């Protein structure tokens, strides 16, 4: 093969991660055609055999639909470990360390939880598991972009607001601005593994050394958060962010 189609969700985090993976493909002199799309469109592309490599499926739960045998894709590698959690801005200095403590009196945490539409079900699970509605908590559903803007402003202002967020994410860049809240009941779900998917029909045609290299490629949550930050905040292209990572200039020292 001299070229591959590389699919990814049409979001900065996934676009930047795909660009990082593409560095390996380019080293084997492959031409790359990117296929950014929605979940539904990507599944249709897979079903039609239009995607050779996909970056990336969050398994075993979030993106399990991609493993439908009819799509013809197989997991490869372990790029990073997505995990959903609740956080408080570190600058708010609330002293709270657990979601369970939100049900107690005497704290000034905002009782309106602004939740992105994409994580609304998980936020509802957390509120229900810890009986937070009985303690005055409500959920305000917002479009993802609006919820991210709210979270960004709350972090910068040091407001005592619950931030419901996956990591990696650009808001985790630097890893010091958010304090995680423990989830002793496991209400928010388990950590995932971000894995590439390779089209079964072309796997035998791909260089075995390249597949081994992809299988061993690990970016980690810090790097992916930094890639996302580079695109969202520093206005870098995905290729520029991936190049900065490759040259060791992406993470703060």
Residue ranges and their predicted role:
Residues 84-94, 192-206:
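A bilobed periplasmic-binding-protein/Venus flytrap-type ligand-binding module shared by bacterial periplasmic
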Residues 72-120:
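A conserved helix-loop-strand patch within extracytoplasmic ligand-binding domains
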Residues 20-28, 106-140, 244-247:
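Ligand-binding cleft/hinge of the Venus flytrap
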Residues 10-12, 33-47, 138-150:
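Short helix-initiation/N-cap motifs at beta->coil->alpha
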Residues 72-79, 164, 173-190:
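Short beta-strand->loop
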Residues 12, 134, 144-156, 164, ...:
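An extracytoplasmic/periplasmic, membrane-proximal ligand-sensing/linker region
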Residues 1-14, 30-35, 110-114, 214:
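Short, well-ordered beta-strand elements
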């Amino acid at each position: 093969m001299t070229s591959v189609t590389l699919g990814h969700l049409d979001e900065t985090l996934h676009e930047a991660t795909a660009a990082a993976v593409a560095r390996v493909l380019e080293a084997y002199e492959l031409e790359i055609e990117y296929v950014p799309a929605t979940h539904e469109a990507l599944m249709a592309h897979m079903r039609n055999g239009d995607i050779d490599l996909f970056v990336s499926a969050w398994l075993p739960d979030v993106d399990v639909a991609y493993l439908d045998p009819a799509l013809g894709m197989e997991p490869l590698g372990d790029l990073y470990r997505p995990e959903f959690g609740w956080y408080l801005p570190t600058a708010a200095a609330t002293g709270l360390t657990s979601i369970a403590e939100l049900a107690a009196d005497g704290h000034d945490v905002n009782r309106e939880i602004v939740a992105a539409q994409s994580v609304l079900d998980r936020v509802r699970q957390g509120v229900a598991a810890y009986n937070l509605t009985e303690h005055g908590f409500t959920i305000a559903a917002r479009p993802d972009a609006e919820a991210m803007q709210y979270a960004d402003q709350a972090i910068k202002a040091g407001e005592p607001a619950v931030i419901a967020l996956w990591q990696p994410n650009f808001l985790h860049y630097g890893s010091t601005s958010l304090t995680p809240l423990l989830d002793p009941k496991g209400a928010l779900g388990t950590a995932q593994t971000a894995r590439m998917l390779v089209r079964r029909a072309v796997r035998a045609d791909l260089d075995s050394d390249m597949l081994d290299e992809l299988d061993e490629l690990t970016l980690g949550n810090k790097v992916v958060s930094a890639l996302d930050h580079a695109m969202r905040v520093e206005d870098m292209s995905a290729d520029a962010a991936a190049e900065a990572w490759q040259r060791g200039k992406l993470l703060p020292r």
